[in-house]
């Protein structure tokens, strides 16, 4: 009994430590996104002044920041994953190796940080639109246009189990494998009652595991971005409706 209590205590401390580390990383991620937004605004001003070389330098710097953004995101996800899977054992646990292995695996997943492509595209579109508003950027095809500056990298807009919009979830989590988003309590209950279950999103074959359904470092930022986009869309619809009414009069 004492041994079990001690093990629970160790696991609890590991979880608490992971929360602190992820929180610190989240602050870094937020700072990077703010820096990228600021650099985008500066690049737009430089493009207006036809200072192409400086714009290119800024784009290269943004690319470097987004690489750091990706690494921070992977580190946070790796920390959460290792903490969730941790089971106390008699021999010493090599946490550095566990974290490094998880980080390497995450970094090898091509779609694990889609928001980086989204942020870079936003930067390039803002610069392009200075002199070419309304024109497609060079190299754009139908697939490229799908990811526009008015879209968010969230794969699903509603929780497949609760039916709630992702923007209204009280405690959102995301599968590390298929990247779909759910309400935490609902998906964990689903996993308990359906061992070895697939993701409940129609057509998705992603496997569900407790340890791989987490609130990763970027999820809350993406949900907040979606809320902002929804507000902008609603304002645009109101303006359009008002304009139509005026035209009819």
Swiss-Prot record:
UniProt key word Cell membrane: no
Pfam families per record: zf-Nse
Record-level GO cellular component terms: cytoplasm; nucleus; Smc5-Smc6 complex
Designated gene of the protein: MMS21
Leader sequence residues: none
Keywords: Acetylation, Cell cycle, Cytokinin signaling pathway, Cytoplasm, Metal-binding, Nucleus, Transferase, Ubl conjugation, Ubl conjugation pathway, Zinc, Zinc-finger
Matches recorded under InterPro entries: Nse2(Mms21) (IPR026846), Znf_MIZ (IPR004181), Znf_RING/FYVE/PHD (IPR013083)
Annotated positions binding Zn(2+): 178, 180, 199, 204
Organism of this sequence: Arabidopsis thaliana
Family, as annotated: Belongs to the NSE2 family.
Described function: E3 SUMO-protein ligase that modulates cell cycle progression and functions as a repressor of endocycle onset in meristems. May function downstream of the meristem patterning transcription factors PLETHORA 1 and 2 (PLT1 and PLT2) in root meristem development. Modulates the expression of the mitotic cyclins CYCB1-1 and CYCB1-2 and cyclin-dependent kinases CDKB1-1 and CDKB2-1 in root meristem. Involved in cytokinin signaling in root development.
Coiled coil: none
Pathway as given in its UniProt record: Protein modification; protein sumoylation
Subcellular location: Nucleus; Cytoplasm
Segments forming SP-RING-type zinc fingers: 141-228
N-acetylalanine modification, residue list: 2
Record has Acetylation as a keyword: yes
Effect after changing residue 180 to A: Loss of function. Loss of autosumoylation
Oligomer and partners: Interacts with SCE1.
Protein name: E3 SUMO-protein ligase MMS21
GO biological process, one term: positive regulation of mitotic cell cycle
Post-translational modification: Sumoylated, possibly via autosumoylation.
Effect of disrupting the coding gene: Dwarf plants with short roots and defective meristems.
């Amino acid at each position: 009994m004492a041994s079990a209590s001690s093990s629970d205590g160790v696991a609890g401390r590991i979880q608490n430590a992971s929360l602190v580390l992820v929180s610190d990383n989240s602050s870094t991620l937020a700072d990077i996104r703010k820096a990228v937004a600021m650099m985008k605004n500066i690049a737009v001003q430089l493009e207006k002044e036809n200072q192409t070389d400086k714009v290119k330098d800024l784009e290269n710097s943004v690319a470097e920041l987004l690489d750091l953004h990706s690494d921070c995101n992977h580190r946070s996800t790796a920390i959460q994953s290792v903490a969730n899977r941790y089971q106390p054992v008699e021999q010493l646990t090599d946490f550095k190796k566990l974290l490094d292995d998880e980080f390497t695996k995450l970094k090898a997943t091509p779609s694990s940080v889609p928001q980086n492509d989204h942020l870079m595209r936003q930067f390039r579109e803002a610069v392009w639109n200075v002199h070419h508003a309304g024109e497609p950027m060079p190299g754009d095809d139908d697939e490229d246009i799908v990811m526009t500056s008015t879209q968010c990298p969230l794969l699903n807009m509603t929780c497949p189990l609760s039916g709630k919009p992702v923007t209204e979830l009280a405690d959102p989590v995301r599968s590390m494998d298929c990247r779909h988003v759910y309400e935490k309590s609902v998906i964990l209950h689903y996993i308990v009652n359906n061992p070895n279950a697939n993701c409940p999103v129609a057509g998705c074959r992603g496997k569900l595991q407790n340890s791989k359904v987490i609130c990763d470092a970027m999820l809350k930022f993406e949900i907040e971005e979606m809320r902002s986009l929804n507000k902008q869309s609603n304002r645009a619809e109101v303006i359009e409706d008002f304009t139509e009414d005026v035209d009819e009069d």
